[in-house]
Amino acid sequence: KECMTDETVCYIHNHNDCCGSCLCLNGPIARPWEMMVGNCKCGPKA
């Protein structure tokens, strides 16, 4: 399965599809509400 490259916005339904981790502004621990509003992006493995 293809993974989503860094800088791709990741949401709660697809955050596991990042090649690395789904990183939110407040740190690598993804907060569900931040994912819902599109504040998180794929980035390096946390």
Curated annotation (Swiss-Prot):
It is found in: Secreted. One of its GO terms (molecular function) is toxin activity. Gene3D superfamilies: 4.10.40.60. Keywords: Disulfide bond, Knottin, Secreted, Toxin. GO terms for cellular component: extracellular region. Disulfide bonds join C3-C19, C10-C22, C18-C42, C24-C40. Pfam families: Toxin_28 (PF08115). Residues 31-33 are annotated as: Keys region for toxin activity. Expressed by the venom gland. Belongs to the neurotoxin 16 (SFI) family. Insecticidal toxin. It inhibits insect voltage-gated sodium channels (Nav) by partially blocking the channel pore in DUM neurons from the American cockroach, not by acting as a gating modifier. The inhibition is only partially reversible after prolonged washout. In vivo, the toxin causes flaccid paralysis followed by death when injected into Heliothis virescens larvae. It also causes uncoordinated movements followed by full paralysis to sheep blowflies (Lucilia cuprina). The presence of a 'disulfide through disulfide knot' structurally defines this protein as a knottin. This is Mu-segestritoxin-Sf1f.
